[in-house]
């Protein structure tokens, strides 16, 4: 970023511009490439990772910063954060070919990750490797959208795989048993609950014991959490794996 004279002109390079018209004037914010769609899809939540500079422009390419008077007149406020959020939510932006390809690839990888985390082969009762999910999605003609979240598209992908019968696949849940020291159990309880679909049993006596239903993708997170926080003294045991209720 280069700041140049006169004051009020800021020149940016390698930028994705979000444009928004309000109150008869044009306003723009300068963002990093690939980040606007991620922010709208709630993949990226840190505005500092989205914005190249925390300011509002009349024209990014010319480096013209919007005046406080123009902002107040158009938006009814000169609160930069509120104005930036409105522009990001409602503004238009163009996506270049390289940026579009990056977005599509990133979203596709996220979709595959969600599908492998939520599903299993009903015959083996085990999750599919990502490579098999990728091939099945390709064979059934699944197409990626950059305007929808990866999770919502993963649910669509699962439905399409089931309809096309490319591979036997069902939504899955694992029943697991977690045993840790009472003190550690009280400390971990809320985090374990946030990762579980359902808590079937929970006992706190000489030790903390919990029977929970989780999606396959969260089993690894729970196992790592318990091992790290208990220094390998806790236990996570898989009791069974079954088709999830729909």
Swiss-Prot record:
<dbReference type="InterPro" id="IPR046928">
    <property type="entry name" value="SDO1/SBDS_C"/>
</dbReference>
<dbReference type="InterPro" id="IPR019783">
    <property type="entry name" value="SDO1/SBDS_N"/>
</dbReference>
<keyword id="KW-0963">Cytoplasm</keyword>
<comment type="subunit">
    <text>Associates with the 60S ribosomal subunit.</text>
</comment>
<dbReference type="Pfam" id="PF09377">
    <property type="entry name" value="SBDS_domain_II"/>
</dbReference>
<dbReference type="GO" id="GO:0042254">
    <property type="term" value="P:ribosome biogenesis"/>
</dbReference>
<protein>
    <recommendedName>
        <fullName>Ribosome maturation protein sdo1</fullName>
    </recommendedName>
</protein>
<dbReference type="GO" id="GO:0005730">
    <property type="term" value="C:nucleolus"/>
</dbReference>
<keyword id="KW-0539">Nucleus</keyword>
<comment type="function">
    <text>Involved in the biogenesis of the 60S ribosomal subunit and translational activation of ribosomes. Together with the EF-2-like GTPase ria1, may trigger the GTP-dependent release of tif6 from 60S pre-ribosomes in the cytoplasm, thereby activating ribosomes for translation competence by allowing 80S ribosome assembly and facilitating tif6 recycling to the nucleus, where it is required for 60S rRNA processing and nuclear export.</text>
</comment>
<dbReference type="GO" id="GO:0005634">
    <property type="term" value="C:nucleus"/>
</dbReference>
<dbReference type="Pfam" id="PF01172">
    <property type="entry name" value="SBDS_N"/>
</dbReference>
<keyword id="KW-0690">Ribosome biogenesis</keyword>
<dbReference type="GO" id="GO:0005085">
    <property type="term" value="F:guanyl-nucleotide exchange factor activity"/>
</dbReference>
<dbReference type="InterPro" id="IPR002140">
    <property type="entry name" value="Sdo1/SBDS"/>
</dbReference>
<dbReference type="InterPro" id="IPR037188">
    <property type="entry name" value="Sdo1/SBDS_central_sf"/>
</dbReference>
<comment type="similarity">
    <text>Belongs to the SDO1/SBDS family.</text>
</comment>
<dbReference type="GO" id="GO:0042256">
    <property type="term" value="P:cytosolic ribosome assembly"/>
</dbReference>
<dbReference type="GO" id="GO:0030687">
    <property type="term" value="C:preribosome, large subunit precursor"/>
</dbReference>
<dbReference type="InterPro" id="IPR018978">
    <property type="entry name" value="SDO1/SBDS_central"/>
</dbReference>
<dbReference type="Pfam" id="PF20268">
    <property type="entry name" value="SBDS_C"/>
</dbReference>
<dbReference type="InterPro" id="IPR036786">
    <property type="entry name" value="Ribosome_mat_SBDS_N_sf"/>
</dbReference>
<dbReference type="InterPro" id="IPR018023">
    <property type="entry name" value="Ribosome_mat_SBDS_CS"/>
</dbReference>
<dbReference type="GO" id="GO:0005829">
    <property type="term" value="C:cytosol"/>
</dbReference>
<dbReference type="InterPro" id="IPR039100">
    <property type="entry name" value="Sdo1/SBDS-like"/>
</dbReference>
């Amino acid at each position: 970023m280069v700041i140049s004279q006169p004051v009020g002109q800021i020149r940016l390079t390698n930028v994705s511009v979000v444009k928004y018209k309000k109150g008869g004037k044009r306003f723009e914010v300068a963002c990093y490439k690939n980040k606007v769609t991620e922010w709208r899809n709630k993949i990226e939540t840190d505005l500092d990772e989205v914005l190249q500079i925390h300011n509002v422009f009349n024209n990014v390419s010319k480096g013209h910063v919007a005046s406080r008077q123009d902002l107040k007149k158009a938006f009814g406020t000169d609160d930069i954060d509120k104005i930036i959020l409105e522009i990001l939510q409602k503004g238009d932006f163009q996506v270049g070919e390289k940026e579009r390809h990056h977005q599509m690839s990133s979203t596709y990888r996220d979709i595959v990750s969600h599908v492998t985390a939520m599903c299993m082969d009903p015959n083996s009762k085990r999750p599919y490797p990502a490579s098999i999910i990728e091939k099945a999605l390709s064979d059934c003609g699944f197409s990626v959208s950059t305007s929808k979240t990866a999770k919502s598209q993963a649910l669509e992908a699962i439905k399409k795989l089931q309809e096309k019968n490319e591979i036997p696949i069902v939504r899955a849940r694992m029943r697991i048993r977690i045993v840790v020291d009472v003190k550690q159990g009280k400390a971990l309880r809320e985090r374990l609950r946030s990762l579980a679909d359902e808590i079937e049993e929970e006992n706190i006596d000489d030790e903390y014991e919990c029977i929970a239903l989780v999606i396959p993708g969260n089993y690894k997170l729970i196992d790592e959490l318990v091992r790290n926080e208990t220094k390998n003294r806790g236990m996570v045991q898989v009791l069974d794996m079954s088709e999830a209720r729909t």
